[in-house]
Amino acid sequence: MMRVIGAGFPRTGTASMKAALERLGFGPCYHMFEIITHPDHVDRWLPAATGATLDWDRVMAGYHSCQDWPAGFFWKELAEAYPQAKVVLTVRDPHRWYASFRWLTSQAGIRRVDPEEAPENVRPMLEGMRRMQPLLARLGREAISPDWRFGEEVPEAQAVDAFHRHVAAVRETLPADRLLVFDVREGWEPLCRFLDVDVPDEPFPHLNEREVMANMFEEMAHGGRLPDLFGAGH
């Protein structure tokens, strides 16, 4: 059963939030990394590319929280499907977010690694991400701009406007007692208070998502294996 829904855009600290939620007992947490490391999950999501209503219990089977796209794109549907779940909207300075989002969407990584030329044991993941493109195209059209596609340049003003629209939509839709607008730089205190759990006696996890993604691309292209994205070092 979904207990915490992440409504933030990618590159708003979603990897750090995944680690934090799992530390607080709300794991496993669904993140885009789950699709990368479990290519069979693609079939759960693909019907949404054409606007079909998803069976959320099937999509989220075994997970108790979610962060990042594609789940975060469907925050409203998830909030309706799981009315007892709380929602965390991760935010950051919109212009700093844009710089990070621009890096992510222009990354060569997955797009330039031909599945046929990749090490055999990462080919299923690359093929899975290729199959995800129709859904990613929908996310880009509806969240950012009707004429924008992943891998293309998006003007800063247009992207920042989309960011502000999204934050406003979430705020306007959900009651204050169900929503936390949260910057991961705030640390444990507001998150734990909102979720009604004790504050851990350890630093809040701050994962460098760009570094995680860059290392992942490098290992996929040359290492012949999928990286441990949330291993002991994180």
Set out the residue ranges of the language-model regions.
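Short His-Asn-centered micro-motif
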Residues: 6-8, 32, 67-71, 91-92, ...
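Short catalytic/ligand-binding loop motif for oxyanion handling, primarily in non-cytosolic enzymes
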Residues: 14-18, 38-39, 74-76, 95-100, ...
